[in-house]
Amino acid sequence: MNIRPILVLSCLVTSATFAAEAPKAPAIPSHPIAKKKELLFSDDFKGSTPDKRWHRVVDTFKVEGGMLKGTQTRDKDVPAADGKPEVKAHAAVFGLEVPTKDSVVEAKIKFEGATMIDIEFDDRKFTGSHYGHIARAQIRLDKVVMLDERDGSQNEEIKALQKDPTKKAEVAKMMAGKSATFPAKFEPGKWYTFTVEVAGDEMRASIDGKAVGYLKSAGIGHATKSKIELGVAGKDGYFGDIKVWNAEPAK
């Protein structure tokens, strides 16, 4: 009996099953979802005195040569010892105290060894998610990731359930639709203009004016985003000429 056709058919069925199970990224709107209003903040990092709204969150960021340089220095877990708590590896994070609801954030970015650069939105007074994380748009060398963290990966209820191995199906159901990944390709050493629009429960990312990521999810519509944070994983990532506008839905 020739079993080769059966094996081929089995492989095709298995592949089709996995393809059906893979989450499908949403269609990206071709036009902006947010309409710019007044400019809330601007920094080209060339001034002699840093704006007081910037602040350290996780080391290490510094201004050099008219650029904001981020380097992940908490790059490994350090176990608890001598009465000191465990320290987990974490991307470098720099905070900006500019409250928004709907907004457009634009910055120049460059990879110089970094594996990830992102723009995120938080509400420190919100206790339903870890550290008040609301949403973020991540740029990696091979993809763009859009995240609703309030109702997804940083949601405190979900994080508690993740500790119970019997709750995997429940967690997966709660996480469905809370993130989207889009293939992309970025070059180290090259400057890009990274734009993130937030309008209601929608978030759209663009690189050099071309839309590269989109997500519609309830957590993104969180009414109070008390601050914006810039993140860099790996070594090193640069930001330049950042601007933040208040905005309204373009529709």
Residue positions per predicted region:
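Bacterial N-terminal signal peptides that target proteins for export
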Residues: 1-7
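Extracellular carbohydrate-recognition regions
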Residues: 22-58, 251
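Beta-strand-rich interaction surfaces with strong enrichment in secreted/lumenal proteins
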Residues: 30-32, 91-97, 180-186, 228-229
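Short tryptophan-centered beta-strand motifs in secreted/extracellular beta-sheet-rich domains
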Residues: 45, 105-107, 189-199, 203-205
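Extracellular glycan-recognition surfaces and repeat-rich motifs
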Residues: 50-80
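Secretory/extracellular carbohydrate-interaction modules
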Residues: 75-165
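Short, aromatic/His-centered strand-loop micro-motif at the edge of beta-sheets
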Residues: 155-193
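Short, solvent-exposed beta-strand-to-loop segments that form ligand-recognition rims
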Residues: 208-227
